[in-house]
A protein has these predicted regions:
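Alpha/beta enzyme core
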Residues: 1-34, 44-180
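Short, hydrophobic beta-strand segments that form beta-sheet elements in well-ordered domains
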Residues: 38-41
Length: 180
């Protein structure tokens, strides 16, 4: 794999709450120069990013970020608005507390609601795996697949329990493999 191939696998991300318009414009310029797959910005910056990306760079955003503690309808509305403003991808955060409680029907319903709201866009679902047991990770992956997610992701990078680790990635791969 060469540098350009690797760059095409990267979402150049800016999700810090203090980000400004000029930060987003600079992010878009960097992404074009580096040849990344996308820029990932907060929903309030989707229109600005869409107007400033070039060189085939896509726009990604988040919903329910970073806590996942938004009602499914709010997540779906946020995602739908972002897609209408130019987002090609949406990274949604599950309500990890519901996963910990084993409320799998709720989890599947919230992912399904966002999936329906993002027709034509990629839907990536963030699980916060550091807060989950192995069994919960596997079950969450299965329910995300059933709900129509395109990808599952380990972590937001903002959760106090931590981020991605080999254990979680292995479980995710064993559960959904190359399907998600």
């Amino acid at each position: 794999m060469d540098r350009n191939q690797l760059a095409k696998m990267i979402d150049h991300t800016l999700l810090k709450p203090e980000a400004t318009d000029s930060d987003v414009i600079a992010l878009c310029a960097e992404a074009a120069e580096l040849g990344t797959f996308s820029v990932c910005v907060s929903p309030t910056f989707v229109s600005l990013a869409a107007a400033n990306v070039s060189n085939g760079v896509k726009v990604a955003t988040v919903c329910g970020f970073p806590s996942g503690k938004h009602e499914a309808e709010i997540k779906a509305s946020e995602a739908k608005l972002s897609v209408s403003q130019g987002a090609h991808e949406v990274d949604m955060v599950i309500d990890v507390g519901r996963a910990i409680m084993g409320d799998w029907d709720y989890l599947e319903a919230e992912v399904s609601a966002v999936r329906k709201a993002t027709s034509g866009a990629l839907l990536k679902v963030i699980l916060e795996t550091a807060a989950l047991t192995d069994e919960q990770i596997a079950k969450a992956c299965q329910r995300c697949e059933s709900a129509g997610a395109d990808f599952v992701k380990t972590a937001t990078g903002f959760h106090p329990a931590g981020g991605a680790d080999v254990r979680a990635i292995k479980i995710m791969h064993e559960t959904v493999g190359s399907k998600l």
